[in-house]
Swiss-Prot record:
Pathway the protein contributes to: Porphyrin-containing compound metabolism
Gene3D superfamilies in UniProt: 3.30.70.3460
Protein name: Siroheme decarboxylase NirH subunit
Reactions catalysed according to its record: siroheme + 2 H(+) = 12,18-didecarboxysiroheme + 2 CO2
Keyword ATP-binding: no
Phenotype reported upon loss of the gene: Insertional mutagenesis results in the loss of respiratory nitrite reductase activity in vivo and in vitro. Mutant strains synthesize a periplasmic cytochrome cd1 that lacks heme d1.
Catalytic activity, EC: 4.1.1.111
Gene that this sequence comes from: nirH
Domain of life assignment: Bacteria
Keywords: Lyase
Family: Belongs to the Ahb/Nir family.
Function: Involved in heme d1 biosynthesis. Catalyzes the decarboxylation of siroheme into didecarboxysiroheme.
Oligomeric form and interacting partners: Probably forms a complex composed of NirD, NirL, NirG and NirH. All proteins are required for the total conversion of siroheme to didecarboxysiroheme.
Pfam families for this protein: AsnC_trans_reg2, NirdL-like_HTH
Length: 168
């Protein structure tokens, strides 16, 4: 029976995620490598990936460049106090900008009026300030206040890792 039509195999799915969460190895055929590691054939491996994507467990499989190695060493989390009536439209607009890697709506907190967050990356400090100004112009009068939190040092940078997590 094919992996993609059998009942959910939680162990196989978890193993696939553990094998791929840090990226695929740079080998001639990463799908064959993954299939061998999983102990299934390549077609079933691809079917499992497709099922996980269709179920929404993974969004996509793609190359993710290391922006630091490409010279983009400056980043800032821009924070914006945006009119709630406009945030859905404006959040989509800001998130579509090529220099924005993450864009989130968050609830305001006491003493922290910001509800829209957008991470920008640039080669130098002037780049990220220019991007902040571009966002400010796009938001127009719907923006009441803003700030930018600039990183001073990377303490940890990884995606979600399931390997080693224990069930409680």
């Amino acid at each position: 029976m094919s992996v993609c039509t059998s009942p959910s195999d939680e162990g196989l799915t978890r193993r696939l995620i553990e094998l791929t969460e840090a990226g695929l190895p740079l080998v001639a055929d990463p799908w064959a490598w993954l299939a061998e590691e999983l102990g299934i054939d390549v077609d079933d491996t691809l079917a499992l990936l497709q099922r996980l994507q269709a179920d929404g467990a993974i969004r996509r499989v793609a190359a993710i460049p290391n922006h630091y190695r490409l010279g983009y060493r400056h980043n800032g989390m821009t924070v914006w106090d945006v009119d709630d009536a406009e945030i859905a439209r404006l959040g989509a607009l800001i998130g579509a900008q090529p220099f924005v890697s993450h864009c989130y709506r968050r609830p305001r907190q006491e003493g922290w009026p910001y509800n829209l967050f957008a991470m920008v990356h640039g080669r130098d400090a002037s780049d990220i300030e220019a991007y902040r100004n571009q966002i400010r112009a796009l938001l127009g009068n719907a923006c009441r206040a803003n700030d930018m939190l600039v990183s001073s040092r990377i303490l940890k940078k990884t995606g979600l890792r399931l390997a080693g997590q224990r069930r409680v």
